[in-house]
Amino acid sequence: MFADSIRAAVENPGPSLRSGCGAVSLTDRKYPARAASWVILIRMDAVTLTRQLVDIESISGNEAPVGNYLYGELCRLGYQTIKMPVEGNRFNVYATSAEHPHPAVVFSTHMDTVPPFIPSSEDAGRIYGRGSCDAKGIIAAQVATAERLRQQGIYVGLLFLVGEERDSLGAQIANEYLADGHPSGCRFLVNGEPTENHIALASKGTLRVEVTATGRMAHSAYPELGESAIDKLIPALTRLRAMPLPSDPEIGPCTLNIGLIEGGRAPNVIPDYAHADLLYRLVGSSEDLRQQIRTTAGDRVEVTFPLELPFLRLRIVDGLPTMIAKFTTDIPKLTNWGEPLLLGPGSIHVAHTDGEYIEKQQLAESIDLYCQIAKHLLEQPK
């Protein structure tokens, strides 16, 4: 089957993927009927490229197979392509044109997906499968954009990252890559996420909060001999849920999700441990909110803040429809890559669902839109 063949190819890469640029193409070996011209494929059929990418499982931590695939094909197209080491066998893919190795505009998105893997399928109007809109359809659109522009003598970069769905580690490493002295020239970063081709005015931030309670185990028949951690945690969470949150008249309210609660050992044991993971979507600075959370949670629990991605206002392009991204992206970790813009095909409302899809028409329109934006940005004075 199509999906089985491509998974086998990337999980057991032959010489083409091990030897780097200029090698025989994986596509030639596995899809001779489709591979008469990879250039025609990405210019004419982003649908096919999207399906190929979706059919390579790349749940966060396992991005190497799809990274190898993209690296090999971008090399074959003639791009100067590098694997930017992240950790273990994980790497980002960065591609530029030999004619202009330090592009002013770079298109970026992520290669990883949330679980579980769902292979691709399609009907007349949609492509389905895990990552179809978040964000493998966007990868296909950005590669097609770079090729279309290159045929017009306009050169942009492509930056495909690992780990966005988990901790943005790939973005952090990409930022350090430039900080370590690698020349860029990048003035604008066009980050792709599913915004239905609307350009984002702003992106909400993320504040992850861990609330932990400890107690003392005892037989449940003698609760007075123990101390229930769950009895400490539940009131703290109840107070946090009732706590007023800040709001922005343009962006909307800060929101809270209690995403995970765990604790206890058995129904007949007084629990000595309880824990909750919370996620706040920020609409401004977190400084006052952090203090409010600590005070509201109280002194019977421990509160920590393991992750924050700040709220951002973003550059827009006049004449394009706008939206507010209530989700977070890699952008806060890519500060060395120029002024950020955020848009892409697909709807965030179906991302991470078992029915994830991308509209074929929206995919095609995004290539036109990305090309227009790149040209507009390149016209801006330095």
List each language-model region with its residue ranges.
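Acidic-glycine-rich active-site phosphate/pyrophosphate-binding loop
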Residues: 111-123, 185-186, 202-212
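Acidic/His- and Gly-rich active-site-bordering loop/insert found
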Residues: 40-132, 342
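Short beta-strand segments
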Residues: 108-109, 159-161, 189-193, 212-214, ...
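A cross-taxon signal for low-complexity, glycine/charged-rich
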Residues: 3-4, 9-14, 19-23, 27, ...
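Metal-dependent amide/peptide-bond hydrolase catalytic core
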Residues: 82-83, 194, 201-202, 208-382
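Secretory-pathway/membrane protein signature
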Residues: 16, 32-43, 52, 77-78, ...
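Acidic/histidine-rich catalytic neighborhood of metal-dependent amide-processing enzymes
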Residues: 140-208, 248-249
